[in-house]
């Protein structure tokens, strides 16, 4: 009986020691992790984005995905990757964040960064070095930014970023309407008057408040005259006169 009690006692001591060690390990793990996270924040404040990313990726790699702080780590990574223009990694983290945290209180920030990335990609830094009008280049990312910004403004009307989003949408609308106007002029030069009218009407529907859309009216008017559709041409002439479009 004594021997049996001794075995139980030894087992209890071993179990207690292992529990204490386990708790100590967990405490050290979270302390180390918190220290690293604080260090990454300091690097972000100093704008040492590469250093911050290195630390944050280390935390993310060794972190339990169920941990409550993972959202903060991912938001910081999105910001840091965006700032160093590593848009592929930024978008990868955005997609992960939106999948795991669709109802997060800062989801509007993440979606807004997504809009800014599309705008940055559209600006095409390579062509900005040369005397080339980037409006004539491919505008895939501009269209992305247009729809993303419209979605953002509709989905998050009370967001702190909505004012800037509206300003950016005006910029993108001007960008796209100027691009469409250059295409419209090409059609007009080649006497494709139906195409001019169709393109112009699309511009007026999407970007009616832009200068380029108003200029499109001049080419629409000339196209109707060229097609000998005089009644419509005269109506457009009156609109041009009233709005003082040149």
Curated annotation (Swiss-Prot):
Key words of the record: Cell outer membrane, Membrane, Signal
GO terms under cellular component? cell outer membrane
The listed locations are: Cell outer membrane
Query: What range does the record give for the signal peptide?
Result: 1-22
Keyword Membrane in the entry? The reply is yes
UniProt-listed InterPro entries:
BamD, BamD-like, TPR-like_helical_dom_sf
The Gene Ontology biological process annotation of the record reads: Gram-negative-bacterium-type cell outer membrane assembly; protein insertion into membrane
Q: What family is this protein classified in?
A: Belongs to the BamD family.
Question: Self-association or partners: how does it assemble?
Answer: Part of the Bam complex.
Q: What exactly does this protein do?
A: Part of the outer membrane protein assembly complex, which is involved in assembly and insertion of beta-barrel proteins into the outer membrane.
Can you say what this protein is called?
Answer: Outer membrane protein assembly factor BamD
């Amino acid at each position: 009986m004594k021997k049996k009690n001794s075995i139980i006692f030894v087992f209890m001591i071993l179990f207690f020691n292992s529990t204490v060690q386990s708790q100590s390990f967990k405490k050290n793990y979270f302390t180390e992790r918190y220290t690293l996270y604080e260090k990454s924040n300091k690097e972000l404040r100093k704008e040492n984005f590469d250093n911050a990313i290195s630390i944050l990726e280390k935390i993310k790699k060794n972190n339990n995905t169920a941990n409550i702080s993972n959202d903060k780590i991912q938001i910081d990574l999105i910001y840091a990757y965006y700032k160093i223009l590593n848009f592929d990694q930024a978008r990868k983290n955005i997609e992960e964040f939106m999948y795991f945290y669709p109802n997060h209180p800062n989801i509007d920030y993440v979606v807004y960064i997504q809009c800014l990335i599309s705008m940055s990609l559209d600006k095409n830094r390579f062509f900005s070095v040369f005397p080339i009008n980037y409006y004539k280049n491919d505008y895939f990312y501009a269209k992305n930014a247009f729809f993303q910004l419209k979605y953002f403004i509709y989905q998050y009307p009370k967001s702190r970023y909505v004012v800037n989003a509206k300003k950016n949408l005006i910029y993108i609308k001007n960008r796209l309407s100027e691009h469409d106007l250059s295409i419209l002029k090409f059609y007009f030069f080649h006497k494709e008057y139906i195409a001019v009218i169709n393109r112009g009407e699309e511009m007026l529907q999407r970007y009616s408040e832009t200068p380029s859309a108003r200029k499109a009216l001049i080419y629409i008017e000339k196209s109707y005259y060229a097609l000998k559709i005089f009644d419509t041409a005269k109506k457009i002439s009156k609109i041009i006169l009233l709005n003082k479009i040149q």
